[in-house]
Amino acid sequence: MKYLFLINPAAGKGKYQPEIADAVRKYFDGKNEDFEIVFTSCAGDAEQRARGIAETGERVRIFAAGGEGTVYEAANGIRGFDNAELGVIPCGTANDFLKYFGDAEPFRNIEAQVNGKAFYIDLIDAGGRLCLNGCSVGMDAMVARDMNLFKRLPAVSGSMAYKLAVLRNFFTPRLGVELSVSVDGGELKKGRWLFAVIANAPYYGGGYKGAPTAVPNDGILDFTCVEAIPHLRVPKFLSRYKRGEFSELSYCSQLRCSRMRFVSERAVPVNRDGEISEETEMSFSLCRDALRFVVPAGAALPDAFKENANIKKF
């Protein structure tokens, strides 16, 4: 098997990438293993590199070292290639998908990653692009959009960028977006929503537990929709929402589905694993067992994940 490490030098403002590259070289030193380190050079490079190696037909384990954008690109690059597996080495913004597996330390350990097992997981097809973690539309997508702008500033950390983005979007005359939403082919339901989330895993947005029951290999997606509420109620709601303790709130709807679609009269920001675009409509659907995801040795496997992994373990 070949091991390809795609390292985004810009992720996390470049703090950890040299350490990761050194750790990779140190681990493989003296071993008769085929490995390669590539520093990505621009947007889309990780996707092209991943697809290029997958197209050779060689069995390959690709590690995306960066933020959610790097992982998103690599996952789309190996779409449809059974010979390719994807692992994640966190060194950028969020990496919320990994929170499902508990402590992130095994994901930073090169030996643990190389010796890990690859399990089939589901993905979300979001307007023709694949997402590991989740998608959203509404206020939180607006926050993600503005966070990407703030975090480019030299003295602004990821957490500070998030706080600034929240403040910018909170102080608006009216919260939420007008959307018509359909689930599993049902009728479109029109309303004003604070946000809507379609999730493959529990956490997104820097640690918000917006889909508490989501399991990334259970063959179903989790949908959360929150009606627009007055400004004064938002801080208390977000506190509960971050902990995943909002199921009893009358203005929150949760269900499980395989498809979701929204339509808007005006273009609204859509978040796809941290990548933002402006759309007037989009469909989201389950892609069952669409990716072999590397869980490093020593990482926690939740019981629900293990139950499903027994069916499709690589």
Report the location of each language-model feature.
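Gly/Ser/Thr-rich active-site loops/lids in small-molecule metabolic enzymes
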Residues: 151-161, 212-232
